[in-house]
């Protein structure tokens, strides 16, 4: 959810995803400054709510200032607020925008850099209370550390984390996965296509307007971008062998990198949804998977 989107097309994309068997719809208040949740809510009017796992997030605030500035989005200053009051208010408002009486998963979007300001115990207790009330079904956290994961489990529970993970961004393998396995926390990966870089459509000559988030993405810097393009070019024979797109190949491999990984793929149009869905039926031969993982390891 960034840049220009056609709302009707977005609703159609969500409907297409559910028709194709996609069950998890993820959004957040910060995406489009509430607009994403409103669009998802419109789509849910035409979808059997029981068919989908619906997740959204809390903890980012732009109606009032807090001591923790997160970033500026489209000229609006966004702050982090992990207080119990903010979390509970966020959920009540998200439920209204989404037109539902419960969330299947609630994530804290970003964690507080100062636990003295927003004690983790207070944050978790608020989420546990919402779960007891039936307003959320599972507790999630995004952009965490191993210590934060342990803190959630100490003060209540943590069902799932949502972290950036791709063939180019693999920090969670060593930093978070051991803790998640120990404590039984599931993992959902966002940005598996690295903002489009791993679709095979980006070249060294591709440029983006000022302010585009890709310009600050380390994977888009010249050296790393060249590695990514060379990696994908080396798999041209595999896209031919499996009759698939580069994006489908990358999604299929990403899902195999971590057992039980939930791969969250963004899509603006029904066509992009269908391309993503095609990765589900792609079964990589053992030798091909080993080869591709070796290629990925060689640039890590």
Per-range role (PLM):
Residues 9-11, 111-300:
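Beta/alpha (TIM)-barrel catalytic core signal, keyed to glycine-rich beta->alpha loops juxtaposed to Asp/Glu
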Residues 19, 43-49, 96-99, 152-156:
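Acidic (Asp/Glu)-rich catalytic clusters
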Residues 1-2, 57-77, 107:
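N-terminal small/glycine-rich loop or linker at the start of catalytic domains
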Residues 4-17, 83-97, 145-151:
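Short, acidic/polar
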């Amino acid at each position: 959810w960034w840049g220009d989107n056609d709302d009707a097309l977005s609703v159609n994309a969500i409907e297409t995803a559910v028709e194709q068997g996609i069950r998890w719809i993820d959004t957040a208040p910060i995406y489009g400054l509430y607009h994403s949740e409103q669009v998802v809510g419109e789509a849910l009017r035409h979808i059997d709510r029981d068919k989908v796992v619906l997740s959204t997030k809390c903890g980012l605030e732009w109606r009032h200032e807090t001591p923790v500035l997160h970033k500026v989005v489209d000229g609006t200053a966004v702050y982090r607020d992990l207080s119990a009051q903010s979390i509970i208010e966020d959920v009540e408002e998200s439920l209204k925008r989404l037109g539902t009486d419960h969330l299947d998963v609630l994530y804290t979007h970003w964690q507080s850099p100062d636990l003295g300001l927003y004690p983790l115990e207070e944050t978790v207790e608020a989420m546990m209370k919402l779960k007891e009330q039936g307003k959320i079904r599972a507790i999630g956290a995004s952009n965490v550390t191993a210590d934060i994961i342990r803190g959630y489990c100490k003060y209540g529970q943590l069902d799932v984390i949502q972290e950036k993970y791709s063939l180019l961004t693999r920090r969670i393998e060593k930093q978070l996965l051991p803790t998640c396995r120990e404590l039984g926390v599931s993992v959902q990966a966002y940005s598996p296509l690295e903002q489009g870089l791993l679709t095979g459509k980006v070249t060294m000559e591709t440029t983006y307007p000022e302010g585009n988030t890709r310009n600050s993405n380390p994977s888009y810097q010249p050296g790393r971008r060249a590695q990514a393009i060379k990696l994908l070019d080396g798999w041209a024979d595999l896209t031919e062998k499996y009759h698939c797109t580069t994006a489908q190949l990358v999604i299929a491999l990403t899902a195999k990198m971590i057992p039980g990984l939930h791969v969250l793929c963004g899509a603006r149009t029904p066509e992009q949804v269908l391309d993503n869905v095609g990765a589900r039926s792609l079964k990589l031969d053992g030798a091909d998977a080993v080869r591709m993982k070796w290629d990925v390891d060689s640039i890590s």
